[in-house]
Amino acid sequence: MFVEMSVCDSPNKNSKLDKKSLTPFKKVRRKNWKQEAAYKSDTSKGQEVSYVGERFIPNRFERENIEFNLKYIGKRKERDILETGVTLTASYWRQSGFISNINRTFGIGERRLFQFSSQQGTRSRVVDNDSADSDWPCNPRARPYAIQNATHEMPGICSPVDYNMMDWSSGGMVAMSSGQDVMLWRNLDESTMVFSVESPTSLKYSPDGKHLAIGCMDRNYPVLDLWEVRSPTEFLVSYRKLFFKSMGYISCIEWSHDGKEVICGTQCGVIIVLAMPTLNTLMQLREHRHTVKKMKFAPTHKYFASSDTDGKIFIFDAVLKVRLLKLDGRSIVFDWHPWTGEDLAVAERSPASIFIFNIPRRQFVASYRRRDDRIVIKTLTYSKITGELLVNVIRRDDADLAVCEILVLASLNRVVDLMSHQDRGTLFLMWNPDGTKIATGGLDDTFSLWNFFPTYKREAILRKQEQKAKDKCSSLSLYKGIR
């Protein structure tokens, strides 16, 4: 499935393949450079060394390779994004801040400070500096906002991390389970409520936060319980669905965007679509042959993706539930881009590999691939506000100790932030509903909350979007009135 590509490279970044990546000029040697070099060689013998007035003749390169030399075309060699750490991250923020301040001070709209051509008859326009060098649509933050603001003790939270056993509802309720009971609390700042559930295997809140679906066991039979959230402290089991014993257990749960369907992935690989609120079976999808590990709808409601423990990903039509394509890999994790709904970020845990797959084109548009097992990818997820890709990695340091950190990528060759803790490490758990906060776990059984994006900036973005929608509606109304 995956095409062999060089590390830290994407198809549109290879200067030897993409002629547009070359500079608009061509270096040409002087015609008599050989005579100058020979004269310099002859006259230098037997003379005293002088440091005044001497002419420096640089080393020569083969003419056919001169255009592809990184030194001449002005491109820095791409570095390994999973091993850069604080060094590259700090340099990015310094460079980004310097460029933005210079442009703001002098009113520069173009990326280059100097333009050696006539500007008469042309209008200056602001150009997206990163559009030509991005592997997906992204608007990275102006500076690193991600800081820890709360830490709680929670034994067993990272042994191991199961993303199907935790969720954060739109109503602010957090549900988690370590396989024994289900713990519920509101906004991480109130007392925890513990409910006794027999062998919970998965859980998921509805989009409106009014229902909580819990997969559990009743003796040897898999069961789906539907809890109605009546208040922050009151829950009612409104419906229960009993499955055949051959299904094994409910491994993961997903809701449709309108909350009218509940999709259950099972141990045997069957995906069951249920209707709300009676939980009647609408259809069964039998593409997988192994335990279904993750299911997720695209944000545009057009596609539905599912993956299993064997590394296979199936893409379905979100409405008809018809299989569109299949991807093969090894121990795969994935996430949809929050804006396009067509770009699927796919990662293989080891050797660490990241691929950006475009569904309509049915091809990989960018890739990163390691050739060793030193780094393992735990999971990856997009920020729905900025479009940045968060990659949770586990690696060994010089003392052979496990280091867990979250790399924030604006592209497959650009690290823009690093979320880490020197002592306990950082394991990604989940986003809060509006995408401004991140919950993480530590190797010392701690639960931490990070501010990823300022709330006031998020509110400003929402107000701007609402204003644009109102302006668009008013323009359409005016157009209809004219007609």
From Swiss-Prot:
Gene Ontology CC annotations of this record: anaphase-promoting complex; cytoplasm
SMART domains xref list: WD40
SUPFAM superfamilies to which the protein is assigned, alphabetical: WD40 repeat-like
Distribution of this protein across tissues and organs: Highly expressed in ovaries. Expressed in nurse cells from stage 6 to stage 12 egg chambers. As oocyte matures, it is transferred from the nurse cells to the oocyte.
Keywords: Cytoplasm, Developmental protein, Differentiation, Meiosis, Oogenesis, Repeat, Ubl conjugation, WD repeat
InterPro entries reported for this sequence: Cdc20/Fizzy, WD40/YVTN_repeat-like_dom_sf, WD40_repeat_dom_sf, WD40_rpt
Induction text: Transcription is activated by grauzone (grau), which binds to its promoter region.
Classification via Gene3D superfamilies: YVTN repeat-like/Quinoprotein amine dehydrogenase
Extent of the WD repeats: 158-195, 196-237, 245-284, 287-326, 421-460
GO molecular function: anaphase-promoting complex binding; ubiquitin ligase activator activity
Top-level taxonomic group: Eukaryota
Post-translation changes: Probably ubiquitinated: degraded following egg activation by the anaphase promoting complex/cyclosome (APC/C).
GO biological process: anaphase-promoting complex-dependent catabolic process; cellularization; egg activation; female meiosis I; female meiosis II; female meiotic nuclear division; homologous chromosome segregation; oogenesis
Entry keyword annotation includes Nucleotide-binding: no
Keyword Ubl conjugation (UniProt): yes
Motif (D-box): 424-432
PROSITE patterns: WD_REPEATS_2 (PS50082), WD_REPEATS_REGION (PS50294)
Pfam families reported for this sequence: WD40 (PF00400)
Record field: transmembrane: none
Subcellular locations according to the entry: Cytoplasm
Assembly description: Interacts with anaphase promoting complex/cyclosome (APC/C) subunits Cdc16 and Cdc27. Interacts with mtrm.
Job description of the protein: Female meiosis-specific activator of the anaphase promoting complex/cyclosome (APC/C). Required for the completion of meiosis in oocytes. Activates the ubiquitin ligase activity and substrate specificity of APC/C and triggers the sequential degradation of mitotic cyclins in meiosis. Promotes the ubiquitination and degradation of CycA early in meiosis I and the degradation of CycB and CycB3 after egg activation. Promotes degradation of mtrm at the oocyte-to-embryo transition.
Family: Belongs to the WD repeat CORT family.
Protein's UniProt name: Protein cortex
